[in-house]
């Protein structure tokens, strides 16, 4: 006699979703404007809610995003000024592409929330002022350079534009632990990223059973910054993978040499991996640029341009 077939119990999802009576929406809750609320605080009241509604609203959307972006078109590692600039151009030029941004910090923006030595103003040398006009950030013209009154104005502006694009998803508090690879004629091709919660990655030495997750993508743009706890991650991994012999090491500060070198050098380092921003200085041995941000923005633009040139080729390879 054959063993009994396994039978799944009836689904209770619908029952659980409807078993608890939810608060009734007030009829006039949607009629309020800011002007109507001002001066009426004695009668003020939020719309009713149940705590489970909040949990489900967050959880459902996040897991839907994880599912949607498990197969992405382009992954950008690092949401600093370079990564966000690249995302802006890609999202604008190719709204058909699914673009995932992975940021290790809770707060995107990298070092672009302040200028040098924790001062407020952001300096960009011309012609990077063209990008400020593109995204609508006001500035003071000082001849060869421009000044944004607070660096946070640039970062918050470009971030808000990028996050409103329907084809872009930011996964912050998430870090890239490794790269997905495939054999190719060039030796190896990068075909995605291995991700984990940042706090989990920071505790691999004292915890166990914390395997990562993955995102497949035919093209990765790495803009993780110069060497540091999370910086220059991809190029350091390429060394350990023996895809590049060694890091060039960032040189001393020279704004005039550094910014030109970073923008011009932004490129695909190995098949499927474009490197931009200060991470590139660790490969090429470029100079440090200090508190001037024009090259970060324009390196992002060039990274996006390079990505669009090679995307179709890498996607065909990825589909094989």
Curated annotation (Swiss-Prot):
Classification via InterPro entries: FAD/NAD-bd_sf, Sti35, Thi4_fam
PTM sites of type 2,3-didehydroalanine (Cys): 209
Major localization listed first in the record, in broad terms: cytoplasm
Entry's cofactor comment: Binds 1 Fe cation per subunit.
Induction, as annotated: Repressed by thiamine. Induced by ethanol, Cu(2+) chloride and heat.
SUPFAM superfamilies with a match to the protein in the record: FAD/NAD(P)-binding domain (SSF51905)
First and last residue of the signal peptide: none
Protein name: Thiamine thiazole synthase
Protein's organism: Fusarium oxysporum (Fusarium vascular wilt)
Lineage: Eukaryota, Fungi, Dikarya, Ascomycota, Pezizomycotina
């Amino acid at each position: 006699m054959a063993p009994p077939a396994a039978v799944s119990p009836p689904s209770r999802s619908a029952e659980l979703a409807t078993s608890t009576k939810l608060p009734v929406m007030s009829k006039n809750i949607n009629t309020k404007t800011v002007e109507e609320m001002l001066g009426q605080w004695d009668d003020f009241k939020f719309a009713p809610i149940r705590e489970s509604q909040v949990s489900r609203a967050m959880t459902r959307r996040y897991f839907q995003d994880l599912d949607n972006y498990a197969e992405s078109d382009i992954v950008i590692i690092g949401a600093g000024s370079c990564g966000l600039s690249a995302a802006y151009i890609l999202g604008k030029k190719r709204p058909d592409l699914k673009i995932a941004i992975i940021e290790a910090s809770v707060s995107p923006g990298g070092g672009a929330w302040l200028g040098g030595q924790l001062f407020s103003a952001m300096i960009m040398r011309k012609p990077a002022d063209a990008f400020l006009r593109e995204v609508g950030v006001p500035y003071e013209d000082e001849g060869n350079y421009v000044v944004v009154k607070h660096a946070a104005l640039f970062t918050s502006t470009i971030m808000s534009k990028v996050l409103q694009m329907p084809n872009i998803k930011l996964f912050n508090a998430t870090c890239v632990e490794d790269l997905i690879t495939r054999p190719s004629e060039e030796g190896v091709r990068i075909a995605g990223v291995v991700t984990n919660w940042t706090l989990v990655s920071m505790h691999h030495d004292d915890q166990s059973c914390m395997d990562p997750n993955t995102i497949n993508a035919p093209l990765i743009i790495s803009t993780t910054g110069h060497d540091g706890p999370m910086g220059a991650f991809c190029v350091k991994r390429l060394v350990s993978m023996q895809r590049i012999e060694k890091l060039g090491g960032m040189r001393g500060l020279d704004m005039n040499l550094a910014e030109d070198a970073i923008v011009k050098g932004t490129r695909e380092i190995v098949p499927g991996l474009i490197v931009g921003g200060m991470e590139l200085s660790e490969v090429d041995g470029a100079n440090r640029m200090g508190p001037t941000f024009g090259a970060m923005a324009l390196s992002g633009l060039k990274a996006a341009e390079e990505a669009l040139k090679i995307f179709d080729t890498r996607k065909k390879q990825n589909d094989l």
